[in-house]
């Protein structure tokens, strides 16, 4: 809730009050790394997102420590050795959905979000393809993309080079509800 409040406050600063905003407090974000020795999977179900269908503005935020791994040792290494989660606690995307979407009509809309992805303290411009689905007034969004560790200065020691891929697959799934400031 804390992060959604921060995102909303930032959005309210730049957007006119009263515009329809949609929020998601439990976006699911999967990480997958395939390497010769082992595959590594992690999931967070606490991502926060805000979408403004009028302007196309889209924001995501996830706490790095919220990712859960099958092996606790992997999770410890992820947070302390690679992501430095105490120093860089969140990954954030701020951008715009380029295609206009009529949220009053049910349908599946291919979309492209352009913006900045900040991971490990390094921001990179990204163009992320995805799908926005409107069904019975419910908006959901899915996206899948690759992130190179080197793009965000995430160093992989040579001793574990065969354990961790140079690029991580990221899958995002979010279902939105209309923002109600009284909730």
How would you describe each model-predicted region?
Residues 17-183:
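Low-complexity, acidic/polar, glycine-enriched regions of mature
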């Amino acid at each position: 809730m804390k992060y959604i409040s921060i995102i909303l406050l930032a959005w309210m600063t730049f957007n006119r009050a009263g515009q329809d905003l949609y929020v998601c407090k439990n976006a699911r974000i999967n990480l997958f790394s395939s390497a010769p020795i082992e595959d590594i999977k992690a999931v967070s179900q606490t991502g926060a997102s805000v979408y403004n269908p009028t302007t196309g503005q889209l924001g995501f935020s996830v706490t790095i420590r919220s990712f859960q791994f099958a092996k606790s040792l992997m999770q410890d290494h992820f947070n302390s050795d690679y992501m430095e989660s105490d120093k860089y606690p969140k990954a954030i995307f701020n951008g715009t959905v380029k295609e206009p979407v009529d949220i009053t009509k049910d349908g599946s809309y291919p979309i492209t979000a352009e913006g900045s992805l900040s991971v490990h303290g390094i921001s990179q411009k990204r163009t992320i393809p995805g799908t926005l689905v409107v069904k019975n007034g419910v908006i959901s969004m899915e996206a899948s993309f690759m992130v190179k560790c080197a793009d965000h200065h995430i160093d992989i020691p040579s001793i574990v080079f065969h354990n961790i891929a140079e690029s991580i697959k990221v899958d995002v799934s979010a279902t939105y509800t209309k923002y109600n400031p009284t909730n």
